[in-house]
């Protein structure tokens, strides 16, 4: 790889989604900071920044010298929109992906959904409405198991006008924050619609889904996240992408390798420390160990694996094709051209 480094790297920006990732464990353990401090490089959190533009880089990856580990839909959208990024690893941690209805509903199977109202979140101010995309993806995948299509149902946009009004009163610095006041008043509109009876079924995934299904005694029509076909399980979190901006990779390949090293170190540690890892994952997911266990299984610590498995690449392409077909991204992409496997291979050898 040709190195075009012109000046020393002073700061690495990082971000990860509130889901199980090796990067998240590495950050909590202090290993990412340690590796970069040894090189006199400061690390800073994108999600904890006071700047809205910097926080938004979690979704659009516009910030130079940054790494992101999380849901693939925003990463795909950024790349398809022209942002020059590279994937330096893929991780796959299967999670519950639930189609849910009320306990008193007569909908018991996926086939029963034909002709019914399916609630889909609509986030008008989102840079990329990944919640909407993953809901349609989960629904479409589930319907394939009974030879139905999304057109066999009525999609109902779910939008909370009262939440939007409250959000507009929030200070600008809290806009798009992950842990600020905006988050406290933000409830999933599709959940409210289901409880009120305005829709017949919805899609939720992860620890949040497990808890909501329990707390409201919802009936699980199907957990498509446990289907034997990995393509039908593929969604925003399966696989997740570890991405950096392309200029960073070109100019600072040793630092990019340090990121991969830190992620792999965290995952190897997790495999041998189940209880501690589950506690860390609960923090990462903004949840409890109970719901992490319900969503990801007792072997959640063993599901932290970053690599370039062929099935992950195929699933990522399938997800990208879905996003283009549903107009979530502006252009088709070839995911193999997006991958930077050489850095990952070098890290494994080292």
List the predicted regions and their residue ranges:
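Short, low-complexity disordered leader/linker segments with a strong preference
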Residues: 1-10, 350
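Short, glycine-/small- and polar/acidic-enriched structural segments
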Residues: 7-151, 155-158
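Short, solvent-exposed loop/beta-turn-alpha elements that line the ligand-binding surface or hinge
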Residues: 33-37, 228-233, 303-311
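Short, surface-exposed acidic
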Residues: 38-46, 147-155, 285-297, 330-336
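Pocket-lining segment of extracytoplasmic ligand-binding domains
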Residues: 73, 164-280
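Secondary-structure end/capping motifs
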Residues: 250-328
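Conserved C-terminal helix/tail region of periplasmic/extracytoplasmic solute-binding proteins
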Residues: 321-350
């Amino acid at each position: 790889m040709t190195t075009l480094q012109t000046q020393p790297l002073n700061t690495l920006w990082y971000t990860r989604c509130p889901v199980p990732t090796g990067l998240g464990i590495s950050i909590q353990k202090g290993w990412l900071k340690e590796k970069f401090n040894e090189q006199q490089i400061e690390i800073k959190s994108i999600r904890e920044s006071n700047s809205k533009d910097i926080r938004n880089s979690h979704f659009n990856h516009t910030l130079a010298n940054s790494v992101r580990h999380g849901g693939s839909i925003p990463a795909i959208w950024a790349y398809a929109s022209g942002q020059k990024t590279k994937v330096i690893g893929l991780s796959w941690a299967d999670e519950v992906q639930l189609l849910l209805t009320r306990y008193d509903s007569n909908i018991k199977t996926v086939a029963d959904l034909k002709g019914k109202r399916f609630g889909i979140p609509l986030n008008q101010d989102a840079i990329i409405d990944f919640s909407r995309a993953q809901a349609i993806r989960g629904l479409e995948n589930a319907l394939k198991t009974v030879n139905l299509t999304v057109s066999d149902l009525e999609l109902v946009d779910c939008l909370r006008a009262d939440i939007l009004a409250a959000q507009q009163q929030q200070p600008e610095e809290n806009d798009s924050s992950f842990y600020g006041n905006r988050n406290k008043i933000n409830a999933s509109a599709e959940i409210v619609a289901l409880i009120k009876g305005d829709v017949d079924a919805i899609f939720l995934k992860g620890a949040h889904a497990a808890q909501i299904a329990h707390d409201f005694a919802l009936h699980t029509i199907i957990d498509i996240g446990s289907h034997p076909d990995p393509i039908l399980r593929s969604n925003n979190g399966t696989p997740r992408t570890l991405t950096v901006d392309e200029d960073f990779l070109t100019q600072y390949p040793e630092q990019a390798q340090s990121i991969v090293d830190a992620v792999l170190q965290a995952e190897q540690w997790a495999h041998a420390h189940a209880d501690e890892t589950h506690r860390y994952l609960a923090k990462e997911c903004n949840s409890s160990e109970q719901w992490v266990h319900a969503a990801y299984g007792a072997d959640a610590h063993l599901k932290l694996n970053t690599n370039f498995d062929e099935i992950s690449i195929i699933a990522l392409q399938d997800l990208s094709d879905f996003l283009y077909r549903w107009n979530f991204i502006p252009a088709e992409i070839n995911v193999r051209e997006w991958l930077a496997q050489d850095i990952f291979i070098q890290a494994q050898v080292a």
